[in-house]
Amino acid sequence: MACAGLLTVCLIRPPAPEPPRPPAPAPAAGPAGHALFQDVFRRADKNDDGKLSFEEFQNYFADGVLSPGELRELFSGVDGHPADNLETEKLCDYFSEHLGVYRPVLAALESLNCAVLTAMDTTKLEYERASKVDQFVTRFLLRETVSQLQALQSSLEGASDTLEAQAQGPRSDEERVEVPSRPRGSRWAGRRALRSVSRSSTWSPGSSNTGQSSEAEMQWRLQINRLQELIDQLECKAPRLEPLHEEELTKGPSSHILVAQRQVQVAEEALQDFHHALCCYVDFTGSQSHCLHVSAQKMLDKASFTLYEFWQDEASWRRHQQSACSKAFQRILIDHLRAPDTLTTVFFPASWWIMNNN
């Protein structure tokens, strides 16, 4: 009986668990940088047909170094034979084969992009209901992440600018290669100028510096980054004229603003005195409550200036003309000009004047 019971227990005992199977191999990811290249060349593909014409290829890759003939040779070499169009996938494969030391860099960029997006999504969901301490930590981590990325970007931009300058070098007019124009805003121009300044912390091909910057250099880069942010803020507050579509204007004293343009030609021997008087006048005029904006431009080829004044209305401008500062400036004009000044006024709808205070 005991044997029968033991046999019954053995028969109903659950089978021993199977040893865990090794995880199935993850699908092979594309080569490093492949996804990044796909996104880049998708932007170059203006008609979104998966191919680049030579015109699209030239517009995107022209850098002022390779001539149109050299670009055409590269265009044909990627595909292996002359063709009118080049598939973006073949272009991705071509660059993937030439990554060299940048292969881990691009792989890290792809991983970084995913990590940043994940962190941003989590922050968006959890920040509002987090404690004040956790919110402080999140802001600190985000700020430091931005600083580190900006420092890396500054180093890369310095290296890129140095290589471009060396590749272009001094060229004669016959050798100069034109780059197709691309729209670039004032913000890009401001940052480009700052990049030229930051290059003084120097990067050059063959340098043994592997990124171990001194404390002074790091502080210098941080100051440049802060200056970039300040430029962005100032540019956002710059006044601009912007018409409203199909706007119905109402007549009244405040329906239009006045723009006064004054062109002057200064005698060479009086430039210093005139410039001092002009600066005083601009400072005084800009401080007036009814003056929207005032600026002066100097022509480089001659001692000529153009002064622009934007006023809320004509009455405000005429009252300003009678002020002691304005009359003193007019006397300066009489004493220091080579020829009589030219004054032009024009009216704009007041609703066109938009001040962006964000």
Swiss-Prot record:
Superkingdom of source: Eukaryota
Biased composition (Polar residues): 197-215
Listed Basic and acidic residues bias regions: 171-181
Domain ABM: 258-347
Cellular component GO terms, alphabetical: cytoplasm; endoplasmic reticulum; Golgi cis cisterna
Region Disordered: start-end pairs: 159-215
Keyword Calcium (UniProt): yes
Annotated binding of Ca(2+), by residue: 45, 47, 49, 51, 56
Annotated protein name in UniProt: N-terminal EF-hand calcium-binding protein 3
Naturally occurring in which organism (per UniProt): Bos taurus (Bovine)
